[in-house]
Amino acid sequence: MRLFVGLGNPGAKYARNRHNIGFMALDRIAEDHGFGPWRVKFQGQIAEGRLGREKVLLLKPETFMNRSGQSVGEAMRFYKLDSTDITVLHDELDLAPGKVKVKAGGGHAGHNGLRSIHDHIGAAYDRVRLGIGHPGRKEAVAGYVLHDFARADEDWLEDVLRGVSEGAPHLAAGDGARFMNSVALRTAPPRPSTGTGRPPAKTPARAEEPPAPAASPAPATAPLPDARSPLQKLVDRFK
């Protein structure tokens, strides 16, 4: 069994916040893959279903971000899971908007939700880091993550959520490379070779030049006058 945890804050007030992209990802997975209805358990909302051959539990902690580990730890102990059976999907300031990366273990990089999970289950769980970008100044971070996504973000956000959902069966199977390929097909689709873009500029054809005129034959050289004496001419005839 796999446990997928999406991080966020509960309530309509926070539903479209950047900090809640983990919740959004789980909602899309549940909808696209026919998971059961959400219900309250483990201090959060859970939904059960299958991704490929794997049984998967989706968990959205409702303890608020800074206490997410309480909910995750409770679910892990109930199902007797190892931390390596858990994948956490969360917002990532250090990735550009629309970028996604998978990571096994490691530090929490100051993310309060991850910090809480570290405290309750250790650091060996997997993560899916969903890039939201950085506001540029440390003091602006809190307001930035607790603000709704801008309208200009909607296109890339939709692509990311679709890619994560389509790749979720690979994620459940532990195949991070194929999961990332599914995401890439949505966030950076290959361009067809016969696309409608502007064709490359053609080199203009050079006008044909008329053939060079044939060289005229050299004029015949006029014979030189015979300067021999009559006697010499006679001698030369009998040589």
UniProtKB/Swiss-Prot annotation:
Its main location: cytoplasm. It catalyses: an N-acyl-L-alpha-aminoacyl-tRNA + H2O = an N-acyl-L-amino acid + a tRNA + H(+). It comes from the Bacteria. GO terms for cellular component: cytoplasm. The record marks 9 as: Discriminates between blocked and unblocked aminoacyl-tRNA. Residues 210-222 have a biased composition (Pro residues). It is an enzyme of class 3 (hydrolase). The keyword Lipid biosynthesis does not apply. The record marks 91 as: Stabilizes the basic form of H active site to accept a proton. One of its GO terms (biological process) is protein quality control for misfolded or incompletely synthesized proteins. It is found in: Cytoplasm. Residues 193-204 have a biased composition (Low complexity). Monomer. This is Peptidyl-tRNA hydrolase. It comes from Ruegeria pomeroyi (strain ATCC 700808 / DSM 15171 / DSS-3) (Silicibacter pomeroyi). The gene is pth.
